[in-house]
Every structure is written in structure tokens, then in C-alpha cells.
A protein has these predicted regions:
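Bacterial N-terminal signal peptides that target proteins for export
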Residues: 1-7
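Sec/Tat signal peptide C-region and signal peptidase I cleavage site
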Residues: 17-21
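N-terminal secretory signal peptides
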Residues: 22-75, 79
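Generic structural hydrophobic/aromatic packing signal, biased to beta-strands
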Residues: 42-45, 80-82, 116, 128-129, ...
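Short, solvent-exposed coil/turn segments at beta-strand boundaries
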Residues: 48-51, 121-125
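C-terminal partner/receptor-binding element of secreted or periplasmic proteins
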Residues: 122-155
Length: 155
């Protein structure tokens, strides 16, 4: 029983550490007469550990009859763009070298798009890498965005 409780706490901590995205909109890429269209959707999120960084993600989403019920597995097609949108005052040396900043389920079972933040201390730059993961195997598809940390408004 203690193990189940510990696993539940660890799962909640893992979920709490990642940012949640807001959907900004979608563009249909195919026409399906009697079911939802395939589309590309744009979402945004703020890095939860680095205030002053915002990212936008475009992801392919599969239409069809499974889509309204969350039964479709979205393809591993995505891109990410992250930018400095305000002052960044976090001490990079206190951040992990590799940490998940965002995760979004892309199927009802075990598949997710994840964005990890890495640090290039030599160049004072944050690196965001998007991947698709599954419990058994993921996809080699990936995307990268870099955020050089610049002075902001005299700070």
C-alpha cells in the first residue's frame, strides 16, 4: 500500500513540473465529409522554471471518428519555437542540465510530445528540444529552439 501511495505522489510531482499549454487555434489540412478533419494546431506555454521564456508548438492532430473521443494517436509531427519575452533572472547553475519543461498527451495510451530544456552555460543559452515518446519506443522526429539570454529593459 505504501508503494502505491509513493507512486501516486511521484506521478503528481512529475505532472506538476511540466507546463500546461493553451491552444491558440487549428488549421484543417484535410477535408473529411462525415468526421473531423486532420489539422495542425498551435499551442503556447511559458517555461514554468524560467520566467521570461515562452514557447509555441505546432502539432499535427489526426481527425476521423476517434478524434472527439481521444482515441486517435496523433502523428509525431511537430515544431517548437521559444523566445525570450521578458527579463530572465533565474540562476542557470541552479537548474538541472536536462529537464522536462512541457508534456502533452498525443494518444489515449502512453504517447506524448515532450519538450526538454537544456542549458548551454558557455553561450548563456537555453535549448528546448521537442521529442515524441512512448513507453516502448519513441520516434526519431525532433525539433529544437534556442533562447540566448539577453539583457532586458536595463536588467
Amino acid at each position: 500500500m505504501k508503494i502505491c501511495g509513493l507512486l501516486a505522489v511521484l506521478a503528481l510531482l512529475a505532472i506538476a513540473g511540466s507546463a500546461k499549454a493553451d491552444d491558440l487555434g487549428c488549421i484543417s489540412t484535410t477535408f473529411k465529409l462525415l468526421s473531423p478533419n486532420d489539422k495542425v494546431c498551435i499551442s503556447d506555454f511559458d517555461d514554468p522554471r524560467v520566467p521570461g521564456v515562452a514557447c509555441h508548438i505546432s502539432q499535427a492532430r489526426k481527425g476521423g471518428w476517434g478524434q472527439p473521443f481521444g482515441l486517435n494517436e496523433d502523428p509525431s509531427n511537430f515544431s517548437v519555437a521559444c523566445r525570450q519575452v521578458g527579463p530572465i533572472s533565474v540562476d542557470l547553475s541552479k537548474l538541472p542540465e536536462n529537464e522536462e519543461a512541457f508534456s502533452q498527451k498525443t494518444s489515449i495510451f502512453f504517447k506524448a510530445t515532450r519538450i526538454y530544456r537544456m542549458i548551454d552555460a558557455k553561450r548563456n543559452t537555453l535549448i528546448y528540444v521537442a521529442i515524441s515518446s512512448k513507453i516502448i519506443n519513441g520516434s526519431p522526429e525532433n525539433a529544437i529552439s534556442t533562447v540566448p539570454i539577453m539583457p532586458w529593459g536595463g536588467k
